[in-house]
Structure formats: C-alpha cells, structure tokens
Amino acid sequence: DEDEDILVKIQKEIGHKNALSHYSQEIDIGDKHYTSHTSRLIISSQKMVEDLEKFGIVKNKSNILNIKIEDIPEEFFFDFLRGIIDGDGCISFTVGGTCNLTITTSTIMAEILNEKIKLIYGKSKFYLTHRHKEVLENATLQATNKHFIYQILERTYKNANIYLNRKYNKYLDYKQYYETHFKKS
C-alpha cells in the first residue's frame, strides 16, 4: 500500500504499539484482474472515538459528514483541510498549463469548507460542482487560480509533520513550479 506512510506517522504520533494490519483483495473489473493491497491502523480507544465524535467525525464519515467546523479552532483548520486533501483531494498541474486543486466530498462539507475559506481570505476561488447530476449529496470543490492554490497549499502544508507523502510531494512540485514562474520577489 503506497499510502502506508501516513499510518506509520499517526502510529508514532499517538504512541500506538500494535502492528499495522495488511489486506489483499482480488478485484475483477470487466476483463481486467487486479489485486488491491490495503493497510490499516486499528486503534481501540473509546476516549479517542468520543473526542472525534464531538467534532462530527464518525464511522462512515464520507457519507454522513456532520463536522462542526465552527468548533474546530482556527489554528487547526488547515491541519483539518490537509486531512481532507490527503483523503479526498487532488493537486494537479502541467508546466505552462493548467493548475487544479480539487476536493470531492459531501455537498454539505464542500459548502462548509468554502464558507470557512471565505471567512479566512475574504473570498474563495473555489467553485462547487456536481460531477454526477443525479447524486447531489456529493460535490467537488475546484480551484484553478494558481495564486489561490499556492496560498491554500502553503498554509495547508506549512510546518506539517503528518501528511500523505505523495500529496506532499505534489505540493512541493507545485510550490517549486509556482515560485520559479509566478512568485514576485
């Protein structure tokens, strides 16, 4: 599992001693056969569950997502956003071409995130779309403004120590590209 690195970081951060669990699953899609490898960090802490539930983070959260974002202290908002980008986001750009930051989540969470960004920056350059018009519960927040994307990613990854390596590396690539081509000294 290429994303196992974040589980190891979380495991170290909370002092969890149990080993990660590893799973393989055979998947057939059309005439293609795949083997999916997954890693899990299993934590059995009722206190941690209760603490997370206070913020609306519950089992099957992607479908329910009842986060009370106003209860998240502002100094932790970008850590929270990093978790969302790592889990359900995409950072993409082409040299000399387009830049995109997308987050796919519930429509309610997309609206809440967009409002929080507006409160912090005075406006938001994210726009909300529904990729599947028949599924209005899910939405995509997308930003294409290279300066806005840079601002968001800089605050999101500044002083971060827990992140998905592949997303962090994408951020570093974008940062270098942006600072080389667009940032004014």
Segments from the language model and where they lie:
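Internal intein/HINT superfamily modules and their associated LAGLIDADG
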Residues: D1-S185
